[in-house]
């Protein structure tokens, strides 16, 4: 059965983007899972709308000691649950979803995604989940990569999808299994249907390192999965006989969790060095097979989360800065990891004026992929990036204003001038996309301020 190592929870999360808690790690009486499952079966059979008012026992899972311990580590103490939309159970059936990242709301707001663990999704399975029961399908290690989310108008949530034509062409509405499927049981069991093939090819075409589909199975009854809000995933069809579906339904509850506090982060010249040269026992992927770009990303996020450090002050000579600049400006969606990795690599050497200047140049670049990578790199620099983000908010380009606004929320100095700037953008910017980011940026700034010595003054 699948489960994570509690002693390496942060390590697993910043690399894989997902951790799994066994029923023992969750820490409630196993009988509770059976009670929830039986109640849910009855409500489902009676076609009731299922929520916590129908099954109040689900709240005991949210209060479980193992869940609290894991969430405290990943998104900080006093984390909260989004009290509306999508906190609901799902039943697995005959259809496949396309690969997607859940919407970053409000719908089509085209907001940048937080690379730091601010949003978390929690999945709870009251029953065991075997490989034929429609296990949730994920793409581990995909949480830091995406596509142009500014000018792509082909879908409802920016471009956080793989092969959105799968949806547009109607394949998501075609049953893969069950009595209305046109596939044979052999095709379904061997995962050789047109749906299976196309969904696998969508992953392969990214050409991103370590990227392979991973079905979250087998799971014991009462397992909890915590994964990054940025992880590509999809709902999956059942592969067993249709007669089993009603007898043994597969339920999954989903909750959106978010960070409400954030400890002050410092620059550190001697951060905790953690090794990524190992086999991921969950996915069986060899992490040492990756390039330096992934390690730069993982190093940053491990130290941010586990050691409260913003950057790793590594000395960068001119040759290294030049190499990273070339990677930051490289073309092609397949090179997304190189651009993002280069940005974090430059951030780690931002004590070098040359490295910082490359990130500033990238922020003002016309290409969205470079600008986005540079934004994350400058966020990795910390408060030192305040002035360049302030400058970006005055641009004639709404997309650059959006990047600057996002950056101020993430790392802008907790100073009145930053609050005033974000407030002005919220009230006066001509772009709804920028105003949306400004509203969230004020919340991000408040999240940082409440944990600092300046909290009373700033609030």
Sequence positions of predicted segments:
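Non-heme Fe(II)/2-oxoglutarate
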Residues: 226, 231-329, 339
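Short edge-strand/loop segments of extracellular domains
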Residues: 90, 139-147, 256-262
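Short, conserved beta-strand element in jelly-roll/cupin
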Residues: 109-131, 218-219, 226, 257
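Structural detector for internal amphipathic alpha-helices that build alpha-solenoid repeat scaffolds
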Residues: 298-319, 337-352, 369-384, 391, ...
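Double-stranded beta-helix
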Residues: 132-233
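Amphipathic alpha-helical scaffolding segments comprising HEAT/armadillo-like alpha-solenoid repeats
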Residues: 318-332, 350-364, 382-394, 413-427, ...
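Extracellular structured ligand-interaction cores
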Residues: 117-123, 133-135, 211-216, 250-252
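Non-heme Fe(II)-dependent double-stranded beta-helix
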Residues: 1-114
């Amino acid at each position: 059965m699948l489960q994570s190592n509690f002693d390496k929870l942060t390590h697993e999360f910043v690399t894989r983007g997902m951790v799994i808690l066994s029923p023992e790690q969750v820490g409630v009486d196993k009988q509770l899972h059976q009670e929830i499952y039986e109640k849910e079966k009855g409500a489902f059979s009676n076609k009731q709308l299922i929520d916590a008012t129908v099954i109040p026992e689900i709240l005991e899972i949210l209060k479980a000691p193992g869940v609290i311990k894991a969430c405290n580590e990943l998104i900080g103490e006093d984390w909260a649950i989004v009290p509306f939309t999508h906190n609901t159970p799902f039943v697995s059936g005959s259809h496949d979803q396309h690969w997607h990242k859940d919407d970053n709301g409000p719908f089509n707001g085209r907001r940048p995604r937080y690379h730091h663990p601010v949003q978390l999704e929690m999945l709870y399975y009251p029953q065991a989940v075997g490989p034929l029961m429609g296990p949730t399908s994920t793409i581990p290690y995909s949480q830091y990569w995406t596509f142009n989310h500014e000018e792509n108008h082909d879908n409802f949530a920016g471009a956080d999808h793989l092969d959105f034509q799968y949806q547009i062409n109607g394949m998501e509405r075609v049953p893969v299994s069950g009595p209305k499927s046109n596939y044979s049981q052999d095709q379904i069991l061997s995962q050789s249907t047109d749906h299976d093939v196309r969904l696998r090819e969508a992953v392969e075409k990214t050409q991103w390192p370590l990227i392979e589909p991973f079905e979250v199975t087998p799971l014991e009854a009462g397992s909890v999965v915590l994964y990054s809000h940025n992880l590509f995933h999809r709902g999956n069809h059942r592969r067993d006989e249709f007669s089993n579906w009603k007898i043994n339904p597969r339920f999954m509850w989903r909750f959106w969790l978010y960070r409400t506090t954030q400890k002050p982060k410092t620059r550190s010249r001697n951060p905790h060095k953690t090794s990524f040269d190992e086999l991921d026992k969950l996915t069986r992927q060899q992490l040492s097979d990756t390039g330096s770009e992934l390690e730069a990303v993982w190093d940053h996020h491990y130290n941010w989360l586990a050691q409260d450090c913003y950057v790793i002050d590594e000395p960068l000579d001119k040759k290294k800065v030049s190499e990273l600049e070339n990677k930051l400006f490289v073309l092609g969606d397949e090179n997304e990891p190189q651009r993002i990795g280069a940005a974090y690599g430059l951030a780690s050497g931002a004590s070098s004026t040359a490295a910082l200047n490359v990130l500033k140049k990238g922020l003002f670049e016309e290409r969205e992929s470079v600008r986005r990578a540079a934004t994350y790199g400058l966020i990795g620099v910390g408060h030192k990036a305040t002035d360049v983000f302030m400058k970006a908010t005055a641009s004639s380009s709404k997309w650059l204003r959006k990047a600057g606004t996002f950056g101020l929320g993430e790392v802008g100095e907790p100073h009145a001038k930053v609050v005033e700037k974000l407030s002005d953008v919220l009230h006066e910017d001509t772009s709804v996309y920028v105003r949306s980011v400004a509203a969230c940026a004020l919340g991000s700034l408040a999240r940082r301020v409440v944990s600092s010595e300046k909290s009373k003054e700033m609030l």
